[in-house]
From Swiss-Prot:
Superkingdom classification of source: Bacteria
Cellular component GO terms, alphabetical: cytosol
GO molecular function, a single term: anthranilate phosphoribosyltransferase activity
Role: Catalyzes the transfer of the phosphoribosyl group of 5-phosphorylribose-1-pyrophosphate (PRPP) to anthranilate to yield N-(5'-phosphoribosyl)-anthranilate (PRA).
Name of the featured protein: Anthranilate phosphoribosyltransferase
Keyword Heme in annotation: no
Known partners and oligomeric status: Homodimer.
Co-factor binding details: Binds 2 magnesium ions per monomer.
Organism whose genome encodes this protein: Rhizobium rhizogenes (strain K84 / ATCC BAA-868) (Agrobacterium radiobacter)
Cofactor list: Mg(2+)
Length: 338
């Protein structure tokens, strides 16, 4: 049985693990071969010292090796946030994902129940009528037939059960808050990834570059793990193997500045109702911010040349009923397991 102790000793000594050492250490963690106190100590030592790009790459590699994979088209995109920004907004990436699917780009969305808000994407999708507890074949069919499939993280990363109790007991952020969005079970190489703190924007773009991602924007928007309409969004874009950084404002999307209070969500029931209201034509701050995130996703996917074009396509998807049709089709296919 492999031992975590040598790796624990290194990080306790503020030494950095190589990529391979991190892979080995996380393999031990996710194989149930470390004690709860070792897991807690290891995760906090990393957190206090600060996780490096190589350590995150090694950890993601271990996590991907253990996940339950899903088949998806090569051009599928994931629109996902780390969660943990503490603001409890509506499920912005969820609505953006349906808009993108309605615009004709396959979406392989990975997500979980709420971490710090009252409703994560899984909570809201469950209320909408989407069946979460489905196998990889059904999810692949959802992506093929509805243009969007939802992968419920805990079903695809069962090895996480070995670290779950320690994470709950620690009650604070660990490296695992970053890993989930980097371990998409469908292997999506295109991604809009929102992070909970600005210092992670560039490092996570570097991680995804090292993991051979194709086209990615890592974003943090004025406190949110989304592109925001409440202020400035920091972006690290990975395109053609190169990372460039820039900032976006609501004006770049042709949108007015919004107040955070107008984006405050509730529980799964409230958030599902808000999402359906936008699908029914309600024009509000939730619609605007979701359109902005969808527009960026359409640029990442190569479907739109510019954010202006992306906004036009996204609005067409919503206003034509294509977004609502993608949702209804996903509900139907996810509940039909024949």
């Amino acid at each position: 049985m492999a031992e975590l102790k040598p790796f624990l000793a290194k990080v306790a000594n503020r030494e950095v693990l190589t990529r391979d050492e991190a892979r080995q250490a996380f393999d031990i963690l996710m194989s149930g071969e470390a004690t709860p106190s070792q897991i807690g100590a290891f995760l906090m030592a990393l957190r206090v010292r600060g996780e490096t790009v190589d350590e995150i790459v090694g950890a993601v590699t271990a996590m991907r090796a253990k996940m339950l994979p899903v088949e998806a088209p090569a051009d599928a995109i994931d629109i996902v946030g780390t969660g943990g920004d503490g603001f409890g907004t509506y499920n912005i990436s969820t609505l953006a994902a349906f808009i993108v699917a309605g615009a004709g780009v396959p979406v392989a969305k990975h997500g979980n129940r709420a971490q710090s808000s009252k409703a994560g994407t899984a909570d809201t999708q469950s209320v909408l009528g989407i069946k979460l507890d489905i196998g990889p074949e059904v999810i692949a069919r959802c992506i093929r037939e509805a243009g969007i499939g939802f992968m419920f993280a805990q079903l695809h990363h069962s090895s996480m059960r070995h670290v779950g109790p320690s994470r709950v007991e620690l009650g604070t952020r660990t490296i695992f808050n970053l890993l989930g969005p980097l371990a998409n079970p469908a292997g999506a190489r295109r991604q809009l990834l929102g992070v909970f703190a600005p210092q992670w924007v560039v490092p996570l773009a570097e991680v995804l570059k090292d993991l051979n991602a194709e086209s990615v924007w890592v974003v943090h928007g004025n406190g949110l793990d989304e592109i925001t309409t409440t202020g400035t969004t920091s972006v690290a874009a990975l395109e053609d193997g190169k990372i460039r950084t820039f900032e976006l404002t609501p004006a770049d999307f042709g949108l007015a500045h919004a107040d955070l209070a107008d984006l405050k969500g509730g529980d799964g029931i409230a958030n599902a109702a808000a999402l359906r209201a936008v699908l029914s034509g309600e024009k509000n701050a939730y619609r605007d911010i979701s359109l902005a995130n969808a527009a960026a996703s359409l640029v990442i996917a190569g479907k739109a040349e510019t954010l202006h074009d992306g906004m036009k396509l996204a609005a067409q998807s919503l206003d034509s009923g294509a977004t609502a049709a993608a949702l209804e089709k996903l509900i139907a296919v996810s509940n039909d397991e024949e």
